[in-house]
């Protein structure tokens, strides 16, 4: 199983309290040390029509109604926190590089659907709403700011991708 499939399986099949650190560690580091890999939390096909992104699986329809900065909704707060954790764990256990698909870094709420016969060649969803992350009244900028800080942290360590991964401790309770 690859990392994006693992995160989807966790979200769909496990309660938060059943997310075991040892399992997360294994899935995000299970590779040959001498082979460079590109790690990513979600794949491009999860954002295509017919599937859901990680953030949408975590927040679902509350994303359309509760993303105002001053709206305190449990599902949204939980989803944002888990989204950040998933991305941080994935990005910091790389063995070569980290990849993000456009818009996923700030939790874009819609799928991508390129013009095709099945949608009457529409361009309606062949876009990303970049204004969402720039709107300081919405929570999307929290995710965008986190992603920016995370990448800055990783870049601050010279040759980060070559840093040996060391499991210090886990407790599956």
Regions found by a protein language model. Name each.
Residues 1-117, 123, 155-173:
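Conserved alpha/beta catalytic core and glycan-binding cleft of carbohydrate-active enzymes
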Residues 119-131:
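Short, helix-capping/interhelical loops that line the mouth of catalytic, cofactor-
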């Amino acid at each position: 199983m690859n990392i994006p499939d693992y995160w989807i399986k966790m979200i769909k099949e496990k309660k938060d309290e059943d997310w075991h650190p040892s399992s997360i560690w294994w899935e995000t580091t299970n590779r040959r040390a001498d082979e460079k890999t590109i790690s990513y939390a979600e794949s491009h096909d999860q954002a295509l029509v017919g599937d859901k992104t990680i953030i949408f699986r975590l927040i679902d329809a509350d994303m359309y109604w509760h993303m105002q900065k001053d709206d305190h909704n449990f599902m949204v707060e939980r989803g944002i926190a888990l989204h950040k954790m998933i991305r941080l764990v994935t990005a910091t256990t790389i063995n070569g590089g980290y990849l993000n698909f456009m818009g996923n870094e700030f939790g874009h709420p819609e799928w991508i659907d390129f013009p095709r016969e099945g949608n009457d060649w529409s361009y309606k969803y062949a876009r990303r709403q970049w204004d969402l992350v720039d709107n300081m009244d919405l929570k999307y900028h929290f995710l965008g700011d986190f992603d920016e800080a995370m990448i800055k942290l990783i870049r601050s360590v010279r040759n980060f991708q070559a840093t040996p991964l060391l499991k210090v401790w886990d407790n599956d309770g």
